[in-house]
Amino acid sequence: MNSIVKTLARSIREYKKTSILTPLLVTVEVVMECAIPFVIANLVNQMQAGCSMDVIVRYGTALLVMAVISLIFGGAAGATCANASAGFARNLRKDMFYKIQDYSFENIDKFSVSSLVTRLTTDISNVQMAYMMIIRVAVRCPLMLVFSFAMGFIMGGRLAMIFLFTIPLLLIGLLLVIRAATPLFRRVFRKYDALNDSVQENVQAMRVVKSYVREDYEKKKFAAAAENVQRDFTKAERIMALNGPMMQFCVYAGMVFVMSYGSYTVITSMGLDLNVGQMSSMLTYSFQILMSLMMLSMVFTMIIMSQESAERIVEVLSEESTLTSPANALTEVKDGSVDFDHVSFKYSKKAERNALSDIDLHIKSGEVIGILGGTGSSKSSLIQLIPRLYDVTEGSVKVGGVDVHKYDLETLRNQVAVVLQKNVLFSGTIKDNLRWGNPNATDAEMEEACRLAQADEFIQQFPQKYDTWIEQGGSNVSGGQKQRLCIARALLRKPKILILDDSTSAVDTATDAKIRQAFREKLPGTTRIIIAQRISSVQDADRILVLDNGQINGIGTHEELLATNKIYQEVYTSQTQGGGDFDKQGGEA
């Protein structure tokens, strides 16, 4: 628990002063509130004794001043508390988001995307509420409890002892509730992750859901996930609901005893030396003790709920990236040569088999390499090792003659532009999306990159041209247009190595040929690695690599492979005669 608190406390930073100021302001507020019943008791006794109007005015003025002070300090405490808790939550979100940005793909794979979203939103909101209660309510309630009990003891000692018996009973009950509810809330948050998984998957694949008329199935699937959350949350809340009635019973029982026994002693003068003013103040202090205990109950409830959230947040903040830049990292890539020296790779140490086995491949700077293989042959896995999105399990990968582990990650990835299988565009203008490749790109540079990617032609047809708004995920452009924009974005990086991971699959063959022709003419010194299903997309490459089940099955020119490689021959024949591809090999890349 201490490590969790220390980790979260780092996010307080500039809000440390307001976090400390809030309890101080609350202390003044509580002192005034506890002093008011004492003054009222004296005023009642003075009035019983037949005091003058001057005395009443003097006491009334004192009460008004104390009430105003309490109001001012209470309002100030509320403002500083809101500022500190909101600032703490903002810093925590930033710290988590920045940490996630440093994660490797392996780290991301460890947490599901929906789980990370839940931790960034719901979990942080829970911790924010708990923090707000801790710096204000959790300070106010114990102070109110102690001061009210002390004042009550001063005014009616033996009568105030009643609360010494009720408070331990309440604490025992509270501990039992905490022990029972904590594991249930842990289960609730796991179910929240599953619910978010369902929502995210459905929203992202809405077009597929509708095209297959699967709305009813998705509704049932979501309803089941929501029901699981409801069921476990209800169980947890049933236990937490015992907290309030238990508190009320104990404290109201104490108040009834105070009222009954106190009134009896006032009437019969049984030696408690308790007068009417003191009796009225004792009732006020009893009420303050009641409210303090009730609020403490709420604080503990919130802390119980937020404890699991805090642990989940700390899991993210404590996760160390599996890929980091070394000390004294190289900040310059000499050229675009790539060497795979007997590389083997698997995504998880627990995996039984390698995704890639004994890959020995040497690519010269400026060379064009085509990669073909069936789905499941690990084509994408191979190219992800070049910008060090994953680390090899065995062997080494070199770029510019240097092991990728020796480079600064930002330097390496700036020189290796990858257009991934799944093309992603962000909400914003076409210019905004293109500038992901180069934030300082000029309009002329963007237009040139789009001409090379054969995107300028369709962009010019839009009314707003390069200022056309792209919806989230590029939902308002076609698959082929999206691919060409992503290629243009990569070209703006002016990389030494350009990797196209099946990035023209949605483009017609004529446009694909134009893109390849433009690359030959304008990018002669750039190393190009092209993954494709169509042989026509790679047949002009200097060499073509055929992958099968994560191993090199053949390598050579188009003509050499046609003469010597059985897989290449079969696919070439099927594509020229009937449009076949490598998918018959099975699996997923």
Regions found by a protein language model. Give the residues of each.
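Juxtamembrane helix-loop junctions of ABC transporter transmembrane domains
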Residues: 1, 24-25, 32-45, 66-113, ...
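Membrane-integrated ABC transporters
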Residues: 1-33, 40, 48-63, 77-81, ...
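An intracellular "coupling" helix at the cytosolic face of ABC transporter transmembrane type-1 domains
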Residues: 13-17, 102-106, 122-135, 139, ...
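Transmembrane helices of ABC transporter permease
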Residues: 14, 18-31, 72, 132-188, ...
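Short intracellular "coupling" helices and adjacent cytoplasmic loop segments at the cytosolic face
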Residues: 49, 86, 94-118, 122-124, ...
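Helix-loop-helix
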Residues: 51-58, 65, 151-165, 235-312, ...
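ABC-type nucleotide-binding domain
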Residues: 332-589
